């Protein structure tokens, strides 16, 4: 049996017994995953925050959200973060996934409407730390994003705030590009897909937060240097490929084609299992390249005369990339988002209970911007 996307494209059967999405044993991420000991505190904090901001309403929606254990993804990403920083990261991650789920239905194929959503969110990202006046027409998504933006940038160096803003703008704008991919008569090539997905995966803002948790901001010339630039791209690609393998059945059930496994199957004319093997090989080649770059980096920095404190910050930053790759895999295999429960939640036209937030206004808002 085949399934259709919202644009009528035929997709493979997501209920096939030869399910390739759990075949992650061949993925080689040679970095250990560690869990932050403050994970449960972050969970309790964020459950309260998503209700205060109006992102979730009602016990049923909150219970369904809680089964995803999204705070654990951040606890893997930032295993050494303070309790306050982890709470803020968990809030951002809650917003990220709730926002992502808005595009599982018809909105995901309407780029002009998405542009309006993006513009409203971009307008909240002031770099001077001054909050934009609230608008009575603001949605819970906008109000919640404003809250976490202000908390994240409070006291941060100006150059870091600019990078953080640029990465979030690119993340938001990429949803317009993904809508165009869904509407196109032909699937994009893998490279065309990655040009957009490298932004919509949201890894770059997460790596910015690695700096924040470490209490430093890399100088621009060091941040943009060749080794770190390529290592960031590798980190994002590995997260993309792992996500696409693990979430394949869920995305087929929802009718979404923005998945590297689906794209490679279409262009190579192979089976889903063969496509999974190919994407796995791409991920493994990238982690091997990352390891080689990381091994040569200390000597490169010393030869360039980079001061010792900056070298320590780079070491922390590189560890942060390792945490993101390893933590994403560990969390993805444990969350209910991609198991049978998560697949059923988006099958047969069903949407998550937090769908529709791009137009809902509501009245809930945080009592005050928390500082972390």
Curated annotation (Swiss-Prot):
It is an enzyme of class 4 (lyase). Residues 1-23, 349-372 are annotated as: Disordered. Substrate binds at residues 197, 250, 337-338. Pathway: Secondary metabolite biosynthesis; terpenoid biosynthesis. A motif (DDXXD motif) lies at residues 100-104. Mg(2+) 1 binds at residues 100, 104. It catalyses: (2E,6E)-farnesyl diphosphate + H2O = (+)-(2S,3R,9R)-pristinol + diphosphate. Catalyzes the conversion of (2E,6E)-farnesyl diphosphate (FPP) to yield a new 5-8 bicyclic (pristinane) sesquiterpenol (+)-(2S,3R,9R)-pristinol via a 1,11-cyclization, which requires the abstraction of the pyrophosphate from FPP to yield the humulyl cation. The only accepted substrate is farnesyl diphosphate (FPP). This is Pristinol synthase.
